[in-house]
């Protein structure tokens, strides 16, 4: 299912302007041998030899003075995540409600704001509740997540990749922790990566 065209498309769609992950590899470095790198990545994914590298922890300041931790994946991991997204997106996209905007094709935060504004204008609403759900990801039960995936994702390669990402660690100041939590979630989503 994953072929060279999928790999090239995944690379094309991956943001390449972000900071490098723990390997220090930039887009320019990776592109120096792009076809060979993508062929090697494809072979490792399909054979099960792909190892999800730890993400590099980085903090960004928030408006309230606190810091938001991010996990910065390697460029190659972003490409691997993107190729799996390309496979899963058509499977799950039809399940989403029209009022859902997060990380969906053809939708943006600006679209969500426009819909919110239109709803406020037509309904005469006056309140907005701002909720930060970032801590929610700390509580996701991986067994439940795997059960959810079991219902529609039967491809062993895809399942193994997801399991590897769920177990990937975090590198902070030279210290490796065993598991990613939302407190150190990978930067956004493959679409943002």
Task: Kindly give the residue locations of the regions a language model identified.
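Conserved polymerase palm-domain catalytic core
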Residues: 37, 44-59, 63, 95-193
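Surface-exposed loop/turn segments and immediately adjacent short secondary-structure elements
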Residues: 1-47
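Non-catalytic, well-ordered alpha-helical scaffold segments
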Residues: 5-8, 24, 28, 39, ...
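Conserved pre-motif C helix in the palm subdomain of viral-like polymerases
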Residues: 67-96, 183-193
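Short, compositionally biased low-complexity segments
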Residues: 2-18, 55-59, 85-91, 170-173
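Residues at alpha-helix boundaries and the short loops/turns that link adjacent helices
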Residues: 1-5, 78, 90-91, 139, ...
